[in-house]
Curated annotation (Swiss-Prot):
Protein name (record): Ribosome-binding factor A
Main subcellular localisation: cytoplasm
Assembly and binders: Monomer. Binds 30S ribosomal subunits, but not 50S ribosomal subunits or 70S ribosomes.
Family the UniProt entry places it in: Belongs to the RbfA family.
Organism superkingdom: Bacteria
Matches recorded under NCBIfam families: rbfA (TIGR00082)
A Gene Ontology cellular-component term: cytosol
Encoding gene per record: rbfA
SUPFAM superfamilies: Ribosome-binding factor A, RbfA
A GO molecular function held by the record: ribosomal small subunit binding
Entry keyword Cytoplasm: yes
Length: 140
């Protein structure tokens, strides 16, 4: 009679094995965390106060990192935030070089993340459809 081994069972169905995460994904996650701390504690630019980092992607060779940001609040001043990030790029890269201990610090590209706007548009479309269905249901 064999003893039930949950690890063996999970491994046999593919749930127990830990999948390897690519280095570029780990570095992108570390950059996202460091950048969030920088925005909260060290960067004093008022244009970057209502900015949050939504996601960070890195190329496999870690030469380019794209940082997607969102702007919170009613005033969406994307061009001003782009200029502020461009001005702070050197400071951010030097901080990342010190904290991440990488041989080469990747080039940073800041991109406005339009996901929230697209979600709002889709929600409006769904609300319009629901309203039309409700109006048609009441009239019939």
């Amino acid at each position: 009679m064999s003893v039930w081994d949950p690890k063996e069972i999970l491994d046999s169905i593919g749930l127990g094995k830990r999948t390897e995460v690519k280095r570029s994904t780990r570095v992108a996650d570390a950059i996202r965390k460091e950048l969030a701390v920088l925005l909260l504690e060290k960067i004093r630019d008022p244009k970057l106060q209502d900015v949050g980092i939504s996601r960070v992607t890195a190329t496999d060779d870690l030469t380019i990192v794209k940082i997607y940001y969102t702007i919170y609040g009613p005033h969406k001043h994307v061009k001003a935030v782009d200029k502020a990030f461009l001005a702070a790029t050197g400071f951010i890269r030097s901080h990342l070089a010190r904290t991440l201990n990488m041989r080469y610090t990747p080039n940073l590209q800041f991109c406005y993340d339009k996901t929230a706007e697209k979600v709002a548009e889709i929600e409006n479309i769904f609300q319009e459809i629901a309203k039309e269905r409700q109006d048609n249901g009441e009239n019939s």
